[in-house]
From Swiss-Prot:
The gene is panC. It comes from Buchnera aphidicola subsp. Schizaphis graminum (strain Sg). Keywords: ATP-binding, Cytoplasm, Ligase, Nucleotide-binding, Pantothenate biosynthesis. GO terms for biological process: pantothenate biosynthetic process. This is Pantothenate synthetase. GO terms for cellular component: cytosol. It is found in: Cytoplasm.
Length: 285
């Protein structure tokens, strides 16, 4: 595996690959790799000639410096996983390489509306950090494909919008959420959960599933009442809720009577650990 930390070396490598007409796939990560990342890499391998994984803990997308400091750093372990999966290139720059003028002086990318609602309200500035680093990676790596998980569903829609409106010649491929046996979605933050907390965390997906089943069985009626019941259930189980609501899965607008494509999006806290999850439903006409 070719480990590249320097932008100039990366650009040289990309020029070589482009000359050979190689199809490039990018899997952007912040490290602390788990089964969800591995599934993305395997999906990439089916679609491209060269898989490039980036590892960069992006300070611009953290509104809480303590959260940034606590984010798990497992570089050696990550390298072993990537070598095992036969990834061709790892791009792992440091902060100075990506933001040489510092965060405050750096140009940023802001996707209007979509980045200001739901998670964007709870974490102002977060999506600006995400879209800025994704644009930088797209510009540097020039992938034909880029691969993202559906757990960060709002992020996925924002990136798709960015690609379309900035005319990037990149196809975004998404992977459904990978879960533990108890239903908990794979996340780098799960390592902070004790065994008992991991069991407790599974109540989140249970609540989401129950809500989806209710909406399907009632063909979209009394959704607000059911959302309220699910919120109460989670609070009773010890969760603090930032977000637990139903949205149009194509636009993330609030649902209306005519909504057929619905997604339940949840962002909750279990102690000091933040968990996010979602599930889509399609209602019949």
């Amino acid at each position: 595996m070719n480990i590249i930390k320097n932008i100039n070396l990366l650009e040289k490598k990309i020029k070589e690959l482009k000359k050979k007409n190689k199809i490039i796939g990018l899997v952007p990560t912040m490290g602390n790799l788990h089964d969800g990342h591995i599934k993305l890499i395997l999906l990439a391998k089916k679609n491209v000639d060269i898989v490039i994984v980036s590892i960069f803990i992006n300070p611009m997308q953290f509104e809480d410096l303590l959260d940034l400091k606590k984010y798990p750093k497992t570089f050696e372990q990550d390298c072993c996983i990537l070598k095992q999966e036969k990834v061709e290139i790892l791009f792992c720059p440091d902060v100075n390489e990506m933001y040489p003028l510092g965060l405050k002086n750096h140009t940023y990318i802001d996707v209007p509306k979509l980045s200001k609602i739901i998670e964007g309200k709870v974490r102002p500035g977060h999506f600006i950090g995400v879209t800025t680093i994704v644009c930088k990676l797209f510009n540097l790596i020039q992938p034909n494909f880029s691969f993202f998980g559906e757990k960060d569903y709002q992020q996925l829609l924002i990136i798709k919008k960015l690609v379309k409106e900035l005319n990037y010649p990149i196809k975004i491929i998404s992977l459904p959420i990978i879960r533990l046996k108890n239903g908990l979605a794979f996340s780098s933050r799960n390592k902070h959960l004790s065994d008992l907390a991991q069991q407790k965390a599974s109540y989140l997906y249970q609540a989401i599933k129950q809500t989806c089943n209710f909406i399907k069985n009632n063909n979209g009626k009394n959704i607000k009442k059911n959302i309220h019941t699910s919120r109460k259930y989670l609070i009773k189980k010890g969760f603090y809720i930032d977000i637990f609501n139903a949205y149009d899965s194509k636009t993330l607008d609030p649902i209306s009577k005519d909504s057929k494509n619905i997604i339940i999006i949840a962002s909750v806290w279990l102690g000091k650990i933040r968990l996010i999850d979602n599930k889509k439903i399609i209602l019949r006409d």
